[in-house]
A protein has these predicted regions:
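Intrinsically disordered, low-complexity regions of eukaryotic proteins
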Residues: 4, 18, 22-25, 35, ...
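Accessory, solvent-exposed terminal regions and/or long lumenal/extracellular loops of proteins
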Residues: 290-354
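Generic alpha-helical propensity signal that fires on short helical segments
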Residues: 23, 45, 101-105, 167, ...
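Intrinsic low-complexity, disordered N-terminal segments enriched in polar/charged/small residues
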Residues: 14-21, 29-33, 45
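Catalytic-domain carbohydrate-binding cleft regions of carbohydrate-active enzymes
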Residues: 1-7, 26, 30, 37-287
Length: 354
């Protein structure tokens, strides 16, 4: 590890932070026992304290400091403009500067389940802009796994297909048998962006939580507290992802009544009302299970090839009216470039009441 590289990462955050950085890094250095290469870990130099610091004692402080340095630099270079910044290595508090992805996972069904289970945890640490390597990073994926992972990944803020060198090429266009379904899932991602972006901003501005376990909303329900493979997405949606090979459906627990939408595309779906309780729900390989809670609605835009071309008018609504026939959604929109998230003009109420 090059010592100047580390010094740049930790201390390039501006002179006003130099004293804090020196104290923080000095505290890490004080824990170091010995110098030089120990266990194959390279030594790095703290020029301010004149001590050598092993990288295994710095760990995520290194990546977190790089994120901070880059975030503050972009803020100086592009004042008032947004920057897309995310890292693999980070520390608590780095969400103020950028997001993270979940690191080197493996192309397996077990890792898809782990991806589902990790999302609430990492977001409770403050990281909203996050996601896993879709299809898996290490090992060879399969067409079915690629499709099922995308069917969950299309709901994550960071949606990215990423693989290691030497593994099977896994760009979606390479899976000819699943290509029509993969294409529709990508289009569905864009159609759902009005909902996904609105819930992302609500979580950032109002601390509502983008992904949550069921027990957060039904804390008195012991069965809801035990569910580990279903997620709440914002205020109005529950997800029950498919994560088992060759499965034609799955068991789902509903703490309350919900409207199930079985989505094959943004335009092709069927729906049914389900009461609270345990259900076995069929789900074909090209389908996504989306449950809407009473009184809520999910806006769908016309799919586009990029966000700049996304047309939010007209908007369809996937609704679940409450006992009074009421369903609505509070949608957030902005220009996608400037930094003014709390302007009142960003909010629109969409009514789907009967």
């Amino acid at each position: 590890m090059d010592r100047n590289f580390l010094r740049l990462a930790v201390f390039a955050t501006g002179p006003e932070h130099a004293a804090d950085d020196a104290e923080l890094f000095g505290a890490v250095a004080a824990q170091v026992e010995g110098h030089g290469r120990i266990g194959g870990v390279g030594a790095v130099q703290d020029d301010l304290a004149g001590q050598q610091v092993r990288h295994d004692r710095v760990h995520n402080l290194y990546g977190g400091s790089m994120t901070r340095a880059a975030g503050e630099a972009f803020a100086d270079l592009r004042p008032g403009r947004r920057t897309l910044l995310y890292s693999r290595s980070s520390i608590i508090g780095s969400h103020r500067y950028g997001g993270i992805w979940l690191g080197d996972n493996h192309s397996s069904w077990e890792q898809l389940l782990a991806n589902i289970q990790m999302m609430p945890s990492v977001q409770m640490c403050g990281f909203l802009y996050t996601g896993a390597d879709l299809c898996g990073f290490a090992g060879d994926t399969t067409p079915d796994l690629a499709l099922r992972w995308l069917e969950f990944g299309l709901f994550t803020p960071l949606m990215r297909n990423h693989a290691a060198a030497g593994t099977r090429e896994q760009e979606y266009f390479r899976f000819a048998d699943q290509l029509p379904a993969l294409r529709e899932m990508l289009r569905l991602r864009y159609a759902l962006l009005p909902y996904l972006y609105s819930e992302f901003m609500k979580s950032a501005l109002e601390n509502t939580g983008y992904f949550r376990p069921l027990g957060f909303d039904w804390p008195a329900d012991p069965e809801a507290r035990e569910v580990q493979d279903q997620l709440l997405l914002g205020d109005g949606v529950m997800l029950a992802p498919m994560y088992t090979q060759n499965a034609a459906g799955r068991h789902v627990y509903l703490p309350g009544p919900m409207q199930l939408y079985r989505l094959r595309s943004a335009e092709d779906y069927d729906t049914e009302a389900l009461p609270a309780g345990h259900h076995y729900v069929h789900c074909a390989l090209n389908e996504v299970l989306l449950f809407v809670r009473p009184g809520h609605a999910v806006p769908l835009a016309k799919p586009a090839a990029c966000t700049a071309a996304l047309d939010e008018q007209p908007i369809a609504l996937l609704a679940c009216p409450d006992a009074d026939g009421h369903a609505a959604y509070r949608m957030y929109t902005d220009d996608g470039e400037t930094m003014d998230p709390e302007h009142d003009g960003h909010w629109t109420v969409l009514d789907a009441s009967h």
